[in-house]
């Protein structure tokens, strides 16, 4: 029996990703002025309309509308035909302060910070790719990233901002994985030459990415399977912050606790603890303790320390699980304040996470491999 696994990604122009970017752009602007601010910002997008809401407690002065329009403009939504226009769309703001009840548990003092909510978070790493991420999600990200880049550079004729990718990897021979199928759905102008459009996608995007990963190019190809993708963006589908949590993480290859990332400051463990769990899992795998590691962590609202931590190696461990648990406990502190300090999560760097995955990019602090030497000892 063949072993096939599939993951998907979306471009920065996807309606849900528009919302993630606006929420994280607002978070960054708040943190620039007030690093200790409490932020939970949500965005809703539909045809030429945005609603920005949430709870934000800060001393910062923020122009929410300007930030939202700037994000839309940078993506390329500057035309009414695209579903939303940065210059003409209506924007409503419904932002309030954080609940005083929640603040009781979080604002303990500067050194002891309670978790912003209860919940479970997962972190995962595998040695099947250079980024320590599963191949399917990694390739999916690269496809839409390249397509968007070519569009912005004016090299991708007829393409519009809304794009999706889906990659199926054949793991029948686990030592030699292959691409089975690549699907791309790319919004396009009303008038275009379909054959030329599809030929460009196969040769200049799909094949280029496959070769980058030193994988086969004789895969099954699906491009805009309905035959037409003119109506897209928030006109084609309503967008919401936090609705692409599997795209943001491991493409379904690892479990997910259900909490979204974007628009949340680091006291929200949905985000910060998931980053820390990824950081720990990646360093443990890079140290050679296992081929695959998944870490689950849980918290109670207002409590600074996790309620539980669980490690799964899927039978790929190279040392005993006791040794792996010891390495985790000795090298990684999952208290909320220590996560924030270790990963430097008071800085305004979150907008970069809102597209093409929160993991696998070397510039992020939770992707550094600074614990490997210590663990190997």
From Swiss-Prot:
GO terms, biological process: one-carbon metabolic process; S-adenosylmethionine biosynthetic process
Homology family: Belongs to the AdoMet synthase family.
Requisite cofactors: Mg(2+); K(+)
Binding site for K(+): 42
Keyword RNA-binding belongs to the record: no
Protein name per Swiss-Prot or TrEMBL: S-adenosylmethionine synthase
HAMAP family named in the record: S_AdoMet_synth1 (MF_00086)
Known role: Catalyzes the formation of S-adenosylmethionine (AdoMet) from methionine and ATP. The overall synthetic reaction is composed of two sequential steps, AdoMet formation and the subsequent tripolyphosphate hydrolysis which occurs prior to release of AdoMet from the enzyme.
